[in-house]
Amino acid sequence: MDTNNIKKIDLFYLNIIIEELNILNIEIDIKELIKLKEEINNISNNIFIKLKLNNINKRIIPILNNNINKLEVIRDKIINNKISINKYPSYISEIININKLYLKILNKIITNNKNIELEEEILFWSDNIKYNLLVIRSDLDPIETNYIDLINVLENKNIDINIYIDLINKLKLDNNLRSRINNKYYDLILNKINYLKELIYNEEII
């Protein structure tokens, strides 16, 4: 797999996980993830780039496992009414799933799986990731960040993104439009997902 693609995948998932852990505001140390993200950002294009990325990804894996374990404990306590449901966002299960998906992708990258591009596409457009990117929160900043993250991905696929930019601008101007915009946006993304999956299954995406 191309090292630039590995770098993009790493930064994409790290950005989401770091942002979500910050919002959750629980006792999970994200300093190491931020540090590893910076290391990835600072990797220059030289003959050792693949080796460096591989080493960093091996260091990310135990952190993800630790995140998953801690988050699952909190989720189970919420389910068993041992923690107030108001203390943590209801989408904590989605954050667990994102950690698991990223973990699965990293394991495939490290083992040099030749089909990683296709499988990564399918994983990325899975319901869990899609839900996380479309989730409506009370805060505008994380909403805006998630929309921009998705737009950047679509832009990399040479897809017309004007309509997505228009939706972000509407979100900025009028928070009351969120639910209606989200429904319209969801339909557009769903169509795009189906289109991408067709390409994947026809082996037209490399």
Protein language model regions, located:
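Leu/Val/Ala/Ile-rich N-terminal alpha-helices, chiefly Sec-type signal peptides and the beginnings
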Residues: 1-66, 196, 200-201
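Secondary-structure edge/capping motif, primarily at the C-terminal ends of alpha-helices
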Residues: 21-29, 47-54, 71-85, 106-113, ...
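An acidic, Gly/Ser/Thr/Pro-rich helix-cap/linker signature
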Residues: 11-15, 65, 124-126, 186, ...
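Charged, well-structured binding/catalytic surfaces in domain cores that contact anionic ligands
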Residues: 84-158, 203
